[in-house]
UniProtKB/Swiss-Prot annotation:
Subcellular locations according to the entry: Nucleus
Name this polypeptide is given: GATA transcription factor 15
Record carries keyword Transport: no
Role: Transcriptional regulator that specifically binds 5'-GATA-3' or 5'-GAT-3' motifs within gene promoters.
Similarity annotation: Belongs to the type IV zinc-finger family. Class B subfamily.
Amino acid sequence: MLDPTEKVIDSESMESKLTSVDAIEEHSSSSSNEAISNEKKSCAICGTSKTPLWRGGPAGPKSLCNACGIRNRKKRRTLISNRSEDKKKKSHNRNPKFGDSLKQRLMELGREVMMQRSTAENQRRNKLGEEEQAAVLLMALSYASSVYA
């Protein structure tokens, strides 16, 4: 069995060891705090050391003060948007002559189709009798009056 006096001695020795470890930790943390306080963080652009928020920049994370970080982000956004606008302009204006000639060809094709339709309609009218032509004419007139009314 264990002697109760031995337990007390063991717990006392453990307490003394713990207090010595705590003292060492306090000393090391205070020395690291002193090193941090001696090396004040400053903004990479303007050099200020007091800001409510540190922001990431070209020099790495938390290297810019709040104001410089916002300015830097806005500049990056405008550069990116300008690049995308330039790309859009270039894609639309690749060959303006090609677009004009394409429009002209489409207009000519439309005219040809209209001419073919009118000749086909004339042929149909010739095949229709007098009553059918009158019916088609009445339908066209009723449709035109409903459109323009």
